[in-house]
C-alpha cells in the first residue's frame, strides 16, 4: 500500500513539474512615472503599478495587450531567455535579448505593445 501511495505521489509531482517547465511566462509591469527624492527624480519605479500583464511564449512569438494610456515605462522579466521588440513588429530571436529572470526597464509609448519570443 505504501508503495502505491509513493508511486502516486511521484507521478503527481512529475506531472506538476513538467507542466511548470512547459510554461515560458513573461511578466510585464507598467508604470506611469519615476520616484522622487529631494525635489528631483530618481531612477526607480513609482508604485503602484498602472497595470500588469503576462504572456506565454511557449507557442512562439506573442504580443502584449496595448499599454495603458498613462504608462510611460515598463518592467519586463522572462522565465527563459527572450528577445523583445517594441515597435509594433513581431519579435524575432535576433532582436534585443533579455536573459532569464533579469528585470529590464524600457520607456514606451502609451497604447504601444511589446512583442516577445523565447530565444534560448
Across the structure, where does each feature detected by a protein language model lie?
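Sec/Tat signal peptide C-region and signal peptidase I cleavage site
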Residues: 17-22
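Short N-terminal segments immediately surrounding and downstream of signal-peptide cleavage
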Residues: 23-36
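Short, surface-exposed beta-strand/strand-loop-strand elements in extracellular ectodomains
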Residues: 77-94
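Surface-exposed ligand/attachment interfaces on beta-rich extracellular proteins
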Residues: 36-70
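Bacterial N-terminal signal peptides
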Residues: 8-16
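Noncatalytic modules at the cell exterior or secretory-pathway interfaces
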Residues: 71-74, 104-119
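Bacterial N-terminal signal peptides that target proteins for export
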Residues: 1-8
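Short, solvent-exposed S/T- and G/P-enriched segments that are highly enriched in secreted/extracellular
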Residues: 57-64, 92-109
